[in-house]
Amino acid sequence: LRVAKGDITAEQAYELLEQAGLGAWVSQLPKGLDTVLGSGATSISGGERRRLLLARALASPARILLLDEPGEHLDPATADTLITDLLQADSKRAIVLVTHRLSALASADEVVLLGKENQSARIIARGSHSQLLATSNEYAWALAQEESSDE
C-alpha cells in the first residue's frame, strides 16, 4: 500500500484492506500489517493477491479508477459483495468497472452493456441496473444466465 501512498497510516491501511475484503485476513496474519509476504506475494492465493492490488489502487490519489474484473478469483457471492462495497464506499472518484458480474452492478450509477456486431464492439444498452432489467432483453437474459450458473 505504501507504493501507492507512502505516508499511509496503519488505520488507513486497515480501512483500505477492509474495503478490498481483506480485513479479517490481515488480522489473522502472524504479524498483521507487518507480515512480510515475500517477493511477488507467491505465498498467498490469487484472490488475495488480486484484492491486495485493489487495496493499492484504492490507496492511490487517482480521481478515476479503471478496475478490470475486480471479483476475479473469488466465489460469486464474495465478488458481488466486493464490487457492491466498492461502488458504495468511494464517492471521491469515478470508478469505471469492467465485469461479467452483472448482479453486482445494482448500486452502479450507470451500466453500459457492450456487445459484438460484425467483429466490432458496440453499446447494446445503457442505464441503471433496474432500468436495464426493465428495458433490455439482452441484459435481463445475461443476468438470468449468471444467476442460474451461480446456483
Kindly label every feature range from the protein language model:
Residues 1-39, 83-84, 92:
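ABC ATPase nucleotide-binding domain helical subdomain, centered on the C-loop/LSGGQ "ABC signature"
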Residues 23-52, 63, 70, 74, ...:
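ABC-fold ATPase nucleotide-binding domain signature/coupling loops
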Residues 54, 98:
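Hydrophobic anchor residue at the start of the ABC signature
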Residues 62-63, 93:
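A residue-level structural signal marking coil residues immediately N-terminal to beta-strands
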Residues 66-68, 96:
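Structural motif
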Residues 72-85:
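Conserved D-loop/post-Walker B switch-helix segment of ABC ATPase nucleotide-binding domains
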